[in-house]
UniProtKB/Swiss-Prot annotation:
This is DNA translocase FtsK. Residues 1-20, 509-529 are annotated as: Disordered. Keywords: ATP-binding, Cell cycle, Cell division, Chromosome partition, DNA-binding, Nucleotide-binding. Although strongly related to FtsK, it lacks the typical transmembrane domains located at the N-terminal part of FtsK. Transmembrane segments: none annotated. Homohexamer. Forms a ring that surrounds DNA. It holds the Pfam family FtsK_gamma.
Length: 529
């Protein structure tokens, strides 16, 4: 097709899409799907990638082993290669050091050793769990891709007993690495631009979407970049639309803290210690036909005349794609909210995944690090950044494109993992599949600020002004005959307090009657004023 050259003085012709006011480039591309019959997405939504047949040969392994031993001797380090593990991205040569030789001596010459061996970079593993050796990890000439489908289709993922299983990728030996977010219980992720951090976060999300139902796990996603997580909008797991406004993101974290305190009150009332015990007790009494009334309900909290029955609590996973932007807007406030959640939220099922491309001490503060013991480092710019996230070096020598170091809770050992890969189309396919299964049940008020609500109340009480939504709500009530506060909340996406205030204003205007036996009547039509 030949490109059409426009005269600089000629106005563009927009008649080609005259049937719509919106250019096709700006229209949301929605794929209509029938509701799937399976309880969870099919692996067929993920692509099969052909394996790379170019692998390292035994002769190459032997040659590199001899070169490593020779170059170490040149640096007055006596060692011999005892074992070799060939992975998808790197090969680890396990060496036995002569008695009296410190592993730190090899680490101190890693840059010189990489230059002598003519590798882009190498990483020295001073400790290999269960072995008396050190490891020298060298990049493979022909890198293997790790498709997400291969990891999710593995026995390790299928048979995992994890509550919140996350597939990270494959380790040095090519074995899938599956971790449990519920046991972490929070995760800090850092990596420079192009390191594969965003793909890694998507891998974690898709792992959960392949294992959990919306009634069991809910997401709050915070996306300062606007484009990274917006693909998940309207999936049924969301508690609120993907948050892109950083001020509203602070409100979402504040809501999480309030929800944490509310859940602890419920656990205390039922005399259980964690979310698992709470849900078991709810199931137990429901099986006996004795639903448990909400012990912290107060008259006026809802329009009900009696306390509603308790339901099982769902896990909540809070994902922040660029934590540094959030800290720039409200650093001290955000730090305190994150610290409170990290300290206490584990037992009641709220878990954090915080990702940043700037692992500096003003972003990952000491207070945050102390309360988030599980970390993942993709490629970073310097040893200082590596120490900031992992408390040790190594991440600066990674190879990018999903190459990562994982440090689990309570362990100083680092696991090198090659992250799973999926395309943007695969992410869209899975999100569309979940959207076809149902709509999200958003909770009003998550993004609202308590200060805004208080100022709104003061403005109405002092000046007597009607709520800006008053006319619309009044028309809705008169036309539908519905006088419940909950219906106003759902229709206009407002919190309970605001909806109740509008209902009170309609009562003052004589449009609806006072509450009688939990109901109101419509008394008149639109007033003249």
């Amino acid at each position: 097709m030949e490109a059409v050259q426009l005269d600089k003085n000629q106005e563009p012709n927009y008649k080609g899409y005259s049937g719509s006011l919106i250019h096709p480039a700006f229209q949301q591309q929605t794929t209509k799907r029938e509701k799937p019959s399976t309880p969870l997405p099919s692996l067929d939504l993920l692509l099969k990638y052909p394996p790379n047949e170019q692998r390292i040969t035994p002769d190459e392994i032997m040659e590199t082993s001899q070169r490593i031993e020779q170059q170490l001797r040149n640096f007055n380090v006596k060692a011999s290669v005892k074992d070799v593990l060939v992975g998808p991205v790197v090969t680890r040569y396990e060496l036995e050091l002569q008695p009296g030789v410190k592993a730190s001596k090899v680490t101190s010459i890693d840059t010189d050793l990489a230059r002598a061996l003519m590798f882009r970079s190498i990483r020295v593993a001073e400790v290999i769990p269960g072995k008396p050796y050190i490891g020298i990890e060298t990049p493979n000439l022909h890198r293997q891709m790790v498709p997400l489908r291969d990891v999710l289709d593995s026995n390790e993922f299928r048979d995992s007993k994890a509550t919140l299983p996350i597939a990270l990728g494959k380790d040095i030996s090519g074995k899938p690495v599956i971790v449990d977010l519920a046991k972490m219980p929070h995760l800090l992720v850092a990596g420079s631009t192009g390191s594969g951090k965003s793909v890694g976060v998507n891998t974690m999300i898709l792992s959960l979407l392949y294992r959990v139902q919306p009634e069991d796990v809910k997401f709050i996603m915070i996306d300062p970049k606007v484009v990274e997580l917006s693909v998940y909008n309207d999936i049924p797991h969301l508690l609120t639309p993907v948050v892109t406004d950083m001020k509203k993101a602070a409100n979402a974290l504040r809501w999480c803290v309030d929800e944490m305190e509310r859940r602890y009150q419920l656990l205390s009332a039922l005399r259980v210690r964690n979310i698992e015990g709470f849900n078991e007790k709810i199931d137990e009494y429901e099986a006996m036909g004795m639903p448990v009334p909400n012990p912290i309900w107060r008259l006026g909290d809802t329009m009900d005349a009696m306390p509603p029955a308790l339901k099982k609590l769902s896990y909540i996973v809070v994902i922040v794609d660029e934590f540094a932007d959030l800290m720039m807007v409200a650093g001290k406030q955000i730090e305190e909210l994150i610290a409170r959640l990290a300290q206490k939220a584990r037992a009641i099922g709220i878990h954090l995944i915080l990702a940043t491309q700037r692992p500096s001490v003003d972003v990952i503060t000491g207070l945050i690090k102390a309360n988030i013991p599980s970390r993942i480092a993709f490629t970073v710019a310097s040893k200082i950044d590596s120490r900031t996230i992992l408390d040790q070096g190594g991440a600066e020598a990674l190879l990018g494109r999903g190459d990562m170091l994982y440090s689990g809770q309570g362990s100083s050992d680092l696991i090198r993992v090659h992250g799973a890969y999926m395309s943007d189309d695969e992410v869209i396919n899975i999100a569309d599949d979940w959207r076809a299964r149902g709509k999200p049940d958003y909770i009003d008020g998550i993004l609202e600020s308590a200060d805004d609500e208080e100022s709104s109340e003061k403005g109405i009480s002092s000046g007597g002004e009607l709520d800006p939504l008053f006319d619309e709500v009044m028309d809705f009530v008169i036309n539908t005959g519905t006088t419940s506060v909950s219906s106003i909340q759902r229709k206009f996406s407002v919190g309970f307090n605001r909806a109740a205030r509008i209902m009170d204003q309609m009562e003052e205007q004589g449009i609806v009657s006072p509450m009688q036996n939990g109901k109101r009547e419509i008394l008149s039509h639109r007033p003249e004023y």
